[in-house]
């Protein structure tokens, strides 16, 4: 499988409570929005939203951010389950978020299905998913020819794997772009893309970081990708 598994919510289905200020909140999934397990989240029945996740997503939206979930999901390429199961899992997470707060809409969910050995440009810490999310949300150019009702595979530019980890952190497409995750690969992808970097406690998730994230003057944590 080449490319990212995408779920894109049509703009018409998302209520515009506030104006989009241009920033995107990139969120890891497991350990940020729902409980993560060492054996993966393998079915909708295993989706357990972390308390306050729905309210936190709604806060971000009401403050002007759009939401893009970016998650590594190698079980697809490992043959544990398929693309349809992934969509079912994500649909259940969306449902739980909205049950907690009706404003907790997610604009885009992107999942890398690859293993480390597949050497793709989308598996975090490589920044392919973040740049793709930016293109989708900001109306840039991307190949949507394989999408049906906003779902399907989108190819990633393999050159996005060429990251100078010994260089300096790049500038993001927008100064308010941020990334929240619970693992080193999440910090790395934020650095490679240029986003403000926030780290979640996987037992608490996004609710433990939301006040810092919405502070536009907070640059987040410092991260050295080769340290």
Regions found by a protein language model. Give the residues of each.
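Asp-based, Mg2+/Mn2+-dependent phosphohydrolase catalytic module
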Residues: 1-25, 84, 91-103, 117-227
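A short alpha-helix capping/helix-coil boundary motif
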Residues: 34-37, 72-73, 164-167
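Active-site neighborhood of HAD-like aspartate-dependent phosphohydrolases
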Residues: 1-68
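Short alpha-helical scaffold segments that flank and stabilize functional sites
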Residues: 28, 56-59, 74, 136, ...
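Short loop/turn and capping residues at structural boundaries
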Residues: 37, 68-71, 110, 145, ...
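Metal-dependent phosphoesterase signature
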Residues: 24-51, 76-85, 99-102, 114-120
């Amino acid at each position: 499988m080449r490319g990212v598994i995408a779920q894109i919510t049509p703009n018409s289905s998302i209520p515009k409570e506030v104006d989009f200020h241009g920033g995107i909140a990139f969120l890891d999934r497991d350990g940020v929005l729902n409980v993560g397990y060492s054996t993966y989240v393998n079915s909708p029945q295993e989706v357990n939203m972390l308390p306050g996740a729905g309210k936190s997503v709604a806060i971000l939206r009401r403050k002007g951010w759009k939401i893009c979930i970016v998650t590594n999901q190698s079980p697809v390429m490992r043959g544990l389950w398929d693309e349809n199961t992934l969509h079912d899992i994500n649909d259940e997470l969306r449902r739980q978020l909205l049950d907690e707060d009706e404003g907790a809409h997610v604009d885009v969910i992107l999942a890398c299905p690859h293993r480390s050995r597949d050497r793709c440009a989308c598996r975090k810490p490589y920044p392919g998913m973040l740049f793709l999310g930016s293109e989708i949300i900001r109306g840039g150019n991307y190949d949507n020819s394989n999408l049906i009702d906003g779902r399907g595979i989108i190819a990633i530019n393999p050159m996005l794997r060429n990251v100078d980890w010994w260089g300096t952190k790049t500038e993001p497409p927008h100064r308010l772009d941020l990334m929240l995750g619970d693992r080193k690969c999440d910090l790395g992808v934020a650095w490679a893309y240029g986003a403000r970097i926030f780290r979640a406690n996987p037992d608490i998730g996004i609710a433990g970081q939301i006040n810092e994230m919405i502070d536009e003057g907070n640059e987040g944590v410092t991260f050295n990708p080769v340290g």
